A protein has these predicted regions:
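The substrate-binding groove and active-site-proximal loops of carbohydrate-active enzymes
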Residues: 26-33, 58, 82-89, 109-110, ...
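Metal-dependent polysaccharide deacetylase catalytic core of the NodB/CE4 family, i.e.
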Residues: 49-121, 135-136, 167-169
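Active-site-adjacent pocket scaffolds in enzyme catalytic domains
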Residues: 103, 107-205
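Generic structural signal for well-ordered alpha-helices
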Residues: 39-43, 66-70, 94-98, 122, ...
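C-terminal domain-boundary segment and adjacent tail
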Residues: 44-50, 185-264
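Conserved, mostly hydrophobic/aromatic
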Residues: 12, 46, 55, 81, ...
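Active-site beta->alpha N-cap acidic-glycine motif
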Residues: 2-74
Length: 264
C-alpha cells in the first residue's frame, strides 16, 4: 500500500546571527537568547498540533541548551546543522556535531543540513556517519545559489539520500522560510497543496529566531515580517489547513528516508 504524501516540518536551530548580515553587532549570548525565545513559540505550536518535526541543531546551540536537548520529545527527530552557524570545517564539524548531539541526547543522529543551504561534498557527509542530507534548495536564489537544474525530488547519490527543500512543480518557486513569511497564507497554502499532489512530499524549513521579536534590529522588512507574533498564528493556520484537508502525513525526515529505502 502506497504511503500518504509526506509533510516534513523542519527547523534549523542555530545562533541568531541574521543581524550580523546587516551590520548590527549582536553577541553570542543574545543570539542564543533570541533563538530560545523563538524556538519556544515554534515548539508550542508543534506540540499543540501534535505533529512531529525534524530539528537540525548546531553544536553551539546544543552546548548551551543541554537540558532542552535531553528533554526533547522522542517523536521529534534531532539532526545536525553543523557545529557553528557562522563558519564550517567539513573535516571536523560534521563529525563533532553529530557526536555531540548523540552524546547529549542519547539518540542516533543520521541527518545533516548545511547552514544557509550551502553545498557540502557528499563524501565528507558520508564519512562523518550520516544517512541523508537536506541542504539542496533546487531553485535560484540571487546571491546565494543557482540549482535550477537540480532534482526537485529525493534521490540517492554517492551513498546518501538527498532530500531537497520543496519548490513548486512549475517555475520552482521556493517554499522556504522567506516565502512563508512574505506570501499571503492562501497563496502559500495552494503552493504547498500543488507540491504535495505532484511531488508526493513537502519539505518546509524555518528558523527559531523568525518567531522571536526582531523589531530592535535594523533588518529588511522581508526578513523581519511577522516577528511580533503574526508568524506564530500563520504557522498554526498552515498546520491546521494540512490536517483539515487531509493533505498528507506529518513525518520526520528520518522516517521519510526509511520509507524511500523500503520503496514505499
Amino acid at each position: 500500500m502506497k504511503s500518504a504524501p509526506a509533510i516534513i516540518l523542519t527547523i534549523d536551530v542555530e545562533e541568531c546571527d541574521i543581524p550580523l548580515e546587516y551590520g548590527y553587532d549582536i553577541d553570542l549570548e543574545e543570539q542564543l537568547d533570541q533563538s530560545r525565545k523563538g524556538l519556544e513559540q515554534f515548539m508550542k505550536v508543534i506540540s499543540e498540533a501534535q505533529v512531529p518535526c525534524t530539528i537540525f541543531c548546531t553544536g553551539v546551540y546544543a552546548q548551551h541548551n543541554v537540558a532542552w536537548i535531553k528533554d526533547l520529545d522522542t517523536k521529534h527527530e534531532l539532526a545536525s546543522h553543523g557545529f557553528y552557524h557562522s563558519h564550517f570545517d567539513p573535516k571536523t564539524d560534521l563529525l563533532s556535531s553529530r557526536l555531540l548531539l548523540e552524546e547529549l541526547s542519547g539518540r542516533k543522529v543520521v541527518g545533516f543540513r548545511m547552514a544557509r543551504m550551502q553545498h557540502v561534498e557528499e563524501a565528507d557527509i558520508l564519512q562523518a556517519g550520516y544517512t541523508y542530507h537536506s541542504s539542496l534548495n533546487p531553485t535560484w536564489i540571487p546571491g546565494r545559489y543557482n540549482h535550477l537544474k537540480a532534482s526537485k525530488l529525493p534521490f540517492f547519490e554517492k551513498g546518501l539520500w538527498n532530500i531537497p527543500a520543496s519548490v513548486t512543480p512549475n517555475f520552482r518557486i521556493p517554499l522556504f522560510w522567506l516565502a512563508f513569511k512574505n506570501f499571503p497564507l492562501v497563496i502559500f497554502r495552494q503552493f504547498c497543496k500543488d507540491t504535495l499532489k505532484k511531488h508526493g512530499f513537502l519539505n518546509l524549513y524555518f528558523h527559531p529566531w523568525e518567531f522571536a521579536d526582531l523589531s530592535k534590529y535594523p533588518l529588511p522588512a522581508h526578513v523581519s515580517r511577522g516577528s511580533k507574533g503574526e508568524l506564530v498564528s500563520k504557522l498554526k493556520s498552515l498546520i491546521r489547513y494540512f490536517q483539515e484537508e487531509g493533505l498528507g502525513e506529518f513525518i520526520t525526515m528520518e522516517n521519510f528516508v526509511k520509507q524511500l529505502e523500503n520503496g514505499k
